[in-house]
């Protein structure tokens, strides 16, 4: 993140915002700058990517599903806009430690004895490390002692759109992002790779809420895509993984996506449109939700 801060200082903060007497490496100035940069970056990334996904990827037929809430898109956006600043405050504390030199982030490929190969290995390691810890954090957030207060707001959206991707309780959002920030404190990682992965991870988070259930058949058993995550929203206690199905299989929480079996929400909408199913005006009761004509436990 110091690469971003350096650019922001050079082009904006130093010439236009802060007095010349306030050094760029002052910890309080860095904290303020990081808070601004993180919030602005988060909003730009969220609105740009989620909007593109909503208009060009998301299947709007899903909005006809009886579990799709009234004014849902507006509510998802409002929830996210209110949550992101609080998530950023917690995140900035870790960014500050990183730019103050407490992590193993570096900008010299020479620090990798095996060059590009080791760089690729670090990326793969990052993905598997974060996927493992996010699985257990996410699963822990479904525990009855914390679910209602922290994670339930994200499960309001049974048929999520890309705008639901970051609609978290701030503590929930921060906890699920924590493995990304912990990794470079344990393992060496190139700064550009770290920043790139941070952006890509946020785009991936949007993509698994986009309602596009297509995955190359050869990858379906391994990749935790939108079909898997939509079933997680619908069925509650399956498919906690972020990128891969590995830990769901190990933890006994893997569920083959209903969409792959022709029983997903799009199939439901199609049957409803053809008159084979009736449309329900409500969205279920307090503890149960309608899915594919049956009630399924959600909490």
UniProtKB/Swiss-Prot annotation:
Domain Fatty acid hydroxylase stretches: 124-252
Transmembrane stretches, by residue range?
32-52, 79-99, 117-137, 186-206
**Histidine box-3 (motif): residue ranges:** 228-233
Give the main localization category: endoplasmic reticulum
Identify the GO cellular component terms for this protein.
Answer: endoplasmic reticulum membrane; membrane
Q: Which GO terms describe its molecular function?
A: C-5 sterol desaturase activity; delta7-sterol 5(6)-desaturase activity; iron ion binding
What is catalyzed by this enzyme? Answer: a Delta(7)-sterol + 2 Fe(II)-[cytochrome b5] + O2 + 2 H(+) = a Delta(5),Delta(7)-sterol + 2 Fe(III)-[cytochrome b5] + 2 H2O; lathosterol + 2 Fe(II)-[cytochrome b5] + O2 + 2 H(+) = 7-dehydrocholesterol + 2 Fe(III)-[cytochrome b5] + 2 H2O; 5alpha-cholesta-7,24-dien-3beta-ol + 2 Fe(II)-[cytochrome b5] + O2 + 2 H(+) = 7-dehydrodesmosterol + 2 Fe(III)-[cytochrome b5] + 2 H2O
Membrane topology recorded in Swiss-Prot or TrEMBL: Multi-pass membrane protein
Q: Is this entry keyworded Aminoacyl-tRNA synthetase?
A: no
Record-level GO BP terms? cholesterol biosynthetic process; cholesterol biosynthetic process via desmosterol; cholesterol biosynthetic process via lathosterol; negative regulation of ferroptosis
* Pathway the protein contributes to: Steroid biosynthesis; cholesterol biosynthesis
Q: Where is this region: Disordered?
A: 274-299
What are its E.C. numbers? 1.14.19.20
Q: Which residues carry this modification: Phosphoserine?
A: 253
Q: Which portions of the chain have biased composition (kind: Basic and acidic residues)?
A: 286-299
Is Transmembrane there in the keyword field? yes
Place the motif Histidine box-1 on the sequence.
138-143
Alphabetical list of InterPro entries matching this protein: Fatty_acid_hydroxylase, Sterol_Desaturase_Related
Q: Which UniProt keywords apply?
A: Disease variant, Endoplasmic reticulum, Iron, Lipid biosynthesis, Lipid metabolism, Membrane, Oxidoreductase, Phosphoprotein, Steroid biosynthesis, Steroid metabolism, Sterol biosynthesis, Sterol metabolism, Transmembrane, Transmembrane helix
Q: Where in the cell is it found?
A: Endoplasmic reticulum membrane
User: What does the protein in this record do?
Assistant: Catalyzes the penultimate step of the biosynthesis of cholesterol, the dehydrogenation of lathosterol into 7-dehydrocholesterol (7-DHC). Cholesterol is the major sterol component in mammalian membranes and a precursor for bile acid and steroid hormone synthesis. In addition to its essential role in cholesterol biosynthesis, it also indirectly regulates ferroptosis through the production of 7-DHC. By diverting the spread of damage caused by peroxyl radicals from the phospholipid components to its sterol nucleus, 7-DHC prevents this form of cell death.
Task: Provide the domain comment.
Answer: The histidine box domains may contain the active site and/or be involved in metal ion binding.
Disease entry from the Swiss-Prot or TrEMBL record: Lathosterolosis: An autosomal recessive disorder characterized by multiple congenital anomalies affecting axial and appendicular skeleton, liver, central nervous and urogenital systems, and lysosomal storage.
Member of which family? Belongs to the sterol desaturase family.
- Under which name does UniProt file this protein? Lathosterol oxidase
Name the source organism.
Homo sapiens
